[in-house]
Amino acid sequence: MTHPQPFIAVIPARLASTRLPNKPLADVGGKPMVVRVAERAREAGAQQVLVASDTQAVLDAARDHGFDALLTRADHPSGTDRLAEVAARFGWRDDTVVVNVQGDEPLIDPTLVRDVASHLAAHPDCAIATAAHPIHDAADVFNPNVVKVALDARSVAMYFSRAPIPWSRDAYQPHWPDVAAMPAPAFPVYRHIGLYAYRARFLRTYPSLAQAPIEQAEQLEQLRAMWHGERIAVLITERAPEAGVDTPADLARVQALFRPSSK
C-alpha cells in the first residue's frame, strides 16, 4: 500500500490586482475566493494549508474559515518570494515539500495538487516539480501567452518559453510567418501549468539568486532556478486545468458555477 506524499500547501494572496481589485476576497458561492482555494488544497490532502498575504483582511477571511494565515511583507516581487519568506519563518526541514497554490484558482483540481507534490518526491535530484499538458492546437503553440516547456527523456524541463518550442522545421518553416496556416503539432508540444511544488531548501535560497537574463526576456520566473542549475520535474497530465480568475468576466464565470441551479 502506498501512502500519499506529505506536503504543505501555501496560498500567496494579494489584493493589489490591476484587472480585478480585491480578488482574494471576491465572493464565490458565499465564501471568499481565497477560502475556496484553501478548501481545494485541503481536499488534496495537505498536512497544513496556509494563506500568506500582506493584507489583514485576507488573513482574517482565512482564519474565519479555519485556515492558518501568516502576515508577510508587502514588497515581494513574486509569489515565490512570498513563499520563501514563509519557509524561512517556519524553519521547515530541507526536504519538506511545499506546494504553491495560486490564490485565484478556486477550481483547481485537488488530485493535480497532490500528484505534483508526489512527483517532486519521486525526483530527489530536482528542487521543483510542476505540470504540463499536451497542446493540440497550432494557435496555442504560437500564442506567446501560452507558456511551452521542452522536456528531456525523464520529463525534466530543458526550457520554458513563450515561443513555439520545439520548433518543427519541416512542419512550420514552409508556412512561416503565416501562423493561421500552421498545421496542428504532429509531435509532443506541452503547455505549462502554473502549479509548483518546491523543496523548502530551495525556497530558502531563492531570494539570494540573481535574476537571469532569460528570465527577464521571457518574463518567466521559473527560468531563474534553471539558470542557477536547479532541475524542474514536469508531471504530464492529459487534461487541461480549469482556468484561473484574472478578470471580471472570469469571476462571473466561476460564480455561475457555484450558484445553485434553479428548478
From Swiss-Prot:
Pathway(s) where this gene product acts: Nucleotide-sugar biosynthesis; CMP-3-deoxy-D-manno-octulosonate biosynthesis; CMP-3-deoxy-D-manno-octulosonate from 3-deoxy-D-manno-octulosonate and CTP: step 1/1; Bacterial outer membrane biogenesis; lipopolysaccharide biosynthesis
Lineage, top ranks: Bacteria, Pseudomonadati, Pseudomonadota, Betaproteobacteria, Burkholderiales
Any one GO biological process: CMP-keto-3-deoxy-D-manno-octulosonic acid biosynthetic process
Family annotation (Gene3D superfamilies): Spore Coat Polysaccharide Biosynthesis Protein SpsA, Chain A
Catalytic activity: 3-deoxy-alpha-D-manno-oct-2-ulosonate + CTP = CMP-3-deoxy-beta-D-manno-octulosonate + diphosphate
Cellular localization per UniProt: Cytoplasm
InterPro entries named in the record: Cytidylyl_trans, KdsB, Nucleotide-diphossugar_trans
Gene Ontology molecular functions: 3-deoxy-manno-octulosonate cytidylyltransferase activity
Cellular component GO terms, alphabetical: cytosol
Keywords attached to this entry: Cytoplasm, Lipopolysaccharide biosynthesis, Nucleotidyltransferase, Transferase
First and last residue of the signal peptide: none
Keyword Cytoplasm: yes
Species this chain originates from: Burkholderia vietnamiensis (strain G4 / LMG 22486) (Burkholderia cepacia (strain R1808))
Documented EC number(s): 2.7.7.38
Protein's job: Activates KDO (a required 8-carbon sugar) for incorporation into bacterial lipopolysaccharide in Gram-negative bacteria.
Protein name (Swiss-Prot/TrEMBL): 3-deoxy-manno-octulosonate cytidylyltransferase
